[in-house]
């Protein structure tokens, strides 16, 4: 009779399960993608049967059949193997399962939405060919999306790790698509109105087709955003990833869109007032897109600012810092362009119209970015004590100072190169000011930014150091005293920050230091208080600068004080 051999289970912390999950989930991901590509190809041929796009495409048909008939069964078998393993809680809590579902959910959502919306826009535009392939791609990937959403929401086998990431990814993608489509639709509508005002003819498709095509993308994106943000509860998520997405997309992206749109509108208005060298229709060309970007961006920004108000203080600070950074970048750009233009005008009083246009662009950037930075950063208001100790503010100050300093150093090198090139070049290629005005403008802007933020960083450090409690130089202090020890205990604790233990002298009655009872029966209270104050001041001076784990302090006889540093226990 042979004994059965027992195969030992993998030891705790073994890399075998991790490697196995990496291989299995990577292979499953690839097989699902291959199968979806094959199915979409076959469905596209079915929808586009009889068209020129699919007629005679033998290679495409062979590829689709191979991907579907070979990759499909392999993907199904591997998925069934993985699905049975997910009865184990360890498998459900693994990073591989969570990352696979998140990655496939994101890929299928993006591909399905892009395919369906592209087909819808093509149909609105009156295209007879091409939309079939987009629709087939969108429908197949929509099925993949529904399948993985079912697994993600499964009551027993849903991932335990990063379960909320698909919600955040879906909401972010929907917001981006919705904002892009809305801006494009509104821009086309405004451009049509502006062209009608300027009586300029437009070529191409009718304006309403462009508006409806962009509106289809906008409505589709808003629907995706609503489904994940409202229906799936994305707005209630308070995880770190959700907060990062809120700040980066909802705040930073919206602020960039708003600042760019408002700045462009102001630039167009300034050109209409002071720089009409070009035709009015050409000057007004970017106005529609700028108004649309500013309007939609401000709405998105205002909404997400309201949402961020209910988040943690760290999220609020991050939203403030990214907004301040955008305003700072716009203001610095305006300063640099302004210096560049001013130097050009000073060197060549009869400068061309291009310099005037450049100057108006700098004024627009400064007029938008400056107030935004001032209202957000509030340089005239001292920061809250709780804000000084936060890592985000320190990182922001160091990052702005470091980046500005790096750009300033590079700009100095460029200026030096231009100066030596001017001195050594025999052929005149313009004045020295013309050669150096662009890097000089950049140097002034980055120098101001670096200098200011370095000064703020130094000031914050001094405030933090002043508010930081003194480091305890003594852990424990033993006070040997006669009489009332309370004044001495208070002084010792204030000077050293240590815990104080009082030992009463046994020879209090015979020492020169009168005990409290003797003082009350014989000496006057005024003399006793003066003696106590003098002894307290003497003790404070004696303990100043003493550093030891334990300190023994012996007072008496009389005004004698002896401080003895001791070693650790």
Briefly describe each language-model feature range.
Residues 509-533:
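Intrinsically disordered, low-complexity terminal tails and inter-domain linkers enriched
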Residues 412:
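Aromatic- and Gly/Pro-rich donor/ligand-binding loops
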Residues 1-8, 474-475, 513, 521, ...:
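Short, intrinsically disordered terminal tails adjacent to the first/last structured region
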């Amino acid at each position: 009779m042979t004994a059965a051999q027992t195969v030992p289970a993998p030891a705790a912390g073994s890399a075998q399960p991790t490697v196995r999950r990496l291989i299995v989930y990577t292979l499953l991901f690839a097989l699902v993608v291959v199968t979806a590509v094959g199915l979409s190809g076959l469905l596209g041929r079915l929808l586009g049967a009889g068209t020129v796009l699919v007629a005679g495409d033998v290679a495409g048909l062979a590829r689709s059949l191979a991907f579907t008939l070979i990759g499909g069964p392999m993907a199904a078998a591997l998925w069934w193997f993985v699905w049975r393993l997910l009865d184990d809680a360890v498998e459900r809590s693994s990073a591989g399962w969570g990352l696979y579902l998140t990655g496939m959910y994101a890929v299928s959502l993006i591909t399905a939405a892009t395919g369906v919306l592209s087909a819808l826009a093509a149909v609105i535009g009156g295209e007879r060919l091409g939309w079939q392939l987009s629709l087939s791609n969108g429908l197949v990937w929509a099925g993949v999306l529904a399948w993985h959403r079912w697994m993600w929401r499964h009551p027993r086998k849903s991932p335990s790790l990063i379960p909320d990431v698909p919600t955040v990814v879906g909401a972010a993608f929907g917001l981006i698509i919705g904002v892009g489509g809305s801006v494009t639709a509104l821009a086309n509508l405004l451009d049509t109105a502006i062209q009608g005002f300027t009586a300029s003819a437009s070529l191409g498709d009718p304006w309403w087709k462009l508006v409806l095509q962009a509106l289809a993308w906008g409505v589709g994106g808003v629907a995706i955003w609503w489904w994940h943000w409202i229906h799936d509860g994305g707005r209630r998520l308070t995880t770190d990833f959700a907060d990062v997405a809120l700040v980066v997309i909802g705040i930073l992206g919206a602020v960039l869109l708003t600042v760019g749109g408002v700045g462009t509108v102001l630039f167009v208005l300034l050109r209409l007032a002071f720089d009409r060298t070009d035709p009015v229709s050409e000057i007004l060309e970017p106005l529609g897109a700028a108004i649309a970007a500013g309007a939609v961006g401000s709405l998105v920004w205002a909404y997400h600012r309201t949402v961020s108000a209910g988040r943690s203080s760290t999220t609020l600070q991050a939203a403030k810092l990214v907004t301040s950074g955008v305003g700072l970048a716009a203001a610095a750009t305006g300063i640099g362009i302004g210096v560049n233009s001013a130097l050009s005008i000073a060197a060549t009083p009869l400068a061309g119209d291009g310099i005037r246009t450049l100057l108006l662009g700098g004024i627009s950037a400064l007029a938008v970015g400056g107030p935004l930075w001032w209202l957000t950063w509030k340089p005239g208001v001292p920061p809250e004590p709780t804000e000084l100790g936060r890592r985000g503010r320190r990182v922001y100050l160091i990052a702005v100072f470091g980046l500005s300093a790096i750009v300033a150093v590079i700009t100095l090198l460029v200026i030096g190169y231009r100066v030596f090139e001017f001195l050594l070049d025999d052929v005149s290629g313009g004045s020295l000011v013309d050669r150096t005005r662009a890097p000089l403008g950049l140097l002034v802007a980055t120098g101001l930014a670096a200098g200011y933020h370095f000064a703020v960083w130094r000031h914050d450090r001094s405030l933090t150091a002043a508010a930081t409690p003194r480091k305890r130089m003594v852990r424990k202090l033993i006070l040997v005293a006669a009489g009332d020890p309370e004044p001495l205990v208070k002084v010792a604790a204030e000077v050293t920050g240590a815990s104080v233990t009082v030992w009463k002298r046994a020879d209090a009655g015979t020492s020169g230091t009168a005990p409290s009872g003797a003082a009350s029966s014989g000496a006057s209270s005024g003399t006793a208080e003066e003696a106590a104050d003098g002894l307290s001041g003497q003790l404070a001076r004696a303990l100043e600068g003493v550093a030891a784990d334990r300190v023994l302090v012996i007072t008496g006889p009389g005004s004698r004080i002896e401080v003895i540093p001791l070693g650790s226990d």
